[in-house]
Amino acid sequence: MKKILFLAILLFAKMALADDAKNEWHNTTLSDATIEKIQAAKYEYKKCVGSEMQKLAYQQQDFRNATDAIMKQCEPVLTKMREIYTEAEVPEVIADRHLKQMRLQTTREALQGMMFSEAARKAGNKPQ
């Protein structure tokens, strides 16, 4: 009985540690042109966020609500980047992870900028 249980545990452990081949990907498979497209889409996303942050309507809102509205406004730009990943046959798991990381990082930066802007307004110094 102990041997059967031991073999079952070993078999289960092997199955649990087996690599999922469809999610396995190596970064060397992307061409330089694809990398440039991804970088261009990332630039467009950050440019969208930056231009939205400059709008007066967002400057007058609470910084949390304004940041949320800005991120929702620029979300379609990330769709273009997702399409680039799909065309390059990058697994969805990896593409989603990168997009989530970039979205979170940009949200943090925008939130920090909006907090600074609001603090400067409350202090009486208007940023230029």
Task: Name each model feature, range by range.
Residues 7-8:
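Sec-dependent N-terminal signal peptides
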Residues 13-18:
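N-terminal signal peptide c-region/cleavage motif recognized by signal peptidases
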Residues 19-24, 125-128:
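Short acidic DE-rich linear segments
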Residues 27-83:
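Short N-proximal segments of mature Sec-exported proteins
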Residues 64-128:
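Compact alpha-helical subdomains of small soluble proteins
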